[in-house]
Amino acid sequence: MEDYKAFLDEKMSKVLLSLDNEYKTLRTGRISSNIFDKIFIQYHGQRTPITQVSSIRIPEARLVVIQPWDKTILNKIEQAILNSDLSMNPSSDGSVIRIKVPALTSERRQDIVKHAKKIAEEHKISTRNIRQDLNNKVKKQEKESEITEDSLKRILDDIQKSTDIYIKKIDAILESKIQEIMEV
């Protein structure tokens, strides 16, 4: 069961990667095309992210230009953005969509921070679930006399230490994201 460390690191690293990907879609003080990653339209009968059917450019700090590759979906993209939780008002000229991005209000920043904390907590729960699953596997091995009681205690301590390290990493990522969100 010495491979438990590699298993644990692999699983918990995936949790950190997932957290990072989730945070890329949160709107902060700086506009990023990543905030459109979770906006979908129906295209050829499939739910498709708008990032896969258009080019998204940010020519100015507060301006986003979305150019669909197929002009027939322009209205679908515009409607999807309006229906999203991004609080943006797109305008189209028939070939491109322009979005003038307003500065985030203090209230909106607080809402985004709450959402970021919720996402972090979900990832902490995932980390703890990984720990629990591995603890159960190790305890089962001890019951089946595959490992000694001393080994069990040592392994459980190692698992807990690794879990604590990853929880601290999640907290550090959260704090960094909060600073980015609150930056004016």
Curated annotation (Swiss-Prot):
Keywords: Cytoplasm, Protein biosynthesis. Its main location: cytoplasm. GO terms for biological process: translational termination. It comes from Borreliella burgdorferi (strain ZS7). NCBIfam families: frr. One of its GO terms (molecular function) is ribosomal large subunit binding. Pfam families: RRF. Responsible for the release of ribosomes from messenger RNA at the termination of protein biosynthesis. May increase the efficiency of translation by recycling ribosomes from one round of translation to another. HAMAP family: RRF. Transmembrane segments: none annotated. InterPro entries: Ribosome_recyc_fac, Ribosome_recyc_fac_dom, RRF_sf. This is Ribosome-recycling factor. The gene is frr. It comes from the Bacteria. The keyword Zinc does not apply. SUPFAM superfamilies: Ribosome recycling factor, RRF. Belongs to the RRF family. It is found in: Cytoplasm. One of its GO terms (cellular component) is cytoplasm.
